[in-house]
């Protein structure tokens, strides 16, 4: 009976169109990643490209395209206060400015900006736990920003006229 239930569940999942996201493909054979400022997003982009169809080029001369991280900043601001005037929530934000150009230096993606944010509650009784949660949320935002950049490159590449 359990085999029938498992087979039925598998059939329902495949019928709904569910599939795993898979590797982030850019449609490029090689991509060089550089950063004008210290950037954890650039590190995350390199990590996401490892093992995928797009190879990481050592320099822009050897690459089909170049991704430049122009700026990256994080911010933590008070979102809300309690009735006693104590911090209740913080807003964490990440801004990344980037540009993509081809091997000839022509812009494929004009300078663009991604801004991500998360709300985190604050607790005076567990400051170390909240600090760890904050770092985890920033890491998650960096990963999401890297994925968005690579997907944007893939969309622009897919919509580019054939040469």
PLM feature spans:
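Bacterial N-terminal signal peptides that target proteins for export
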Residues: 1-6
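C-terminal motif of bacterial Sec signal peptides marking the signal peptidase cleavage site
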Residues: 12-15
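Bacterial signal peptide processing site
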Residues: 17-20
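Acidic/histidine-rich, surface-exposed loop or edge segments in extracytoplasmic proteins
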Residues: 25-32, 125-131
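N-terminal segment of the mature soluble domain
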Residues: 27-73
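Sec/Tat-exported extracytoplasmic proteins
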Residues: 49-53, 100-104, 124, 148-160
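Surface-exposed short loop/turn segments
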Residues: 68-113, 117-135, 151
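C-terminal/domain-edge helix-coil "capping" segments
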Residues: 128-163
């Amino acid at each position: 009976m359990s085999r029938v239930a498992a087979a039925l569940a598998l059939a329902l999942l495949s019928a709904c169109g569910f599939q795993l996201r898979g590797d982030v493909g850019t449609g490029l054979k090689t991509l060089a990643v550089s950063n004008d400022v210290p950037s954890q997003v650039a590190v995350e982009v390199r990590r996401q490209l490892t093992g995928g169809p797009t190879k990481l080029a050592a320099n822009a001369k050897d690459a089909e395209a170049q991704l430049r991280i122009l700026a990256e900043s994080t911010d933590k601001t008070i979102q809300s206060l309690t009735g006693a005037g104590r911090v209740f929530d913080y807003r964490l934000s990440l801004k990344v400015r980037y540009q993509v150009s081809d091997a000839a230096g022509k812009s494929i993606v004009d300078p663009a900006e991604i801004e991500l944010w998360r709300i985190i509650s604050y607790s005076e009784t567990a400051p170390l736990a909240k600090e760890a949660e904050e770092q985890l949320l920033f890491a998650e935002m960096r990963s999401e920003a890297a994925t968005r950049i690579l997907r944007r490159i893939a969309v622009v590449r897919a919509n580019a006229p054939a040469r």
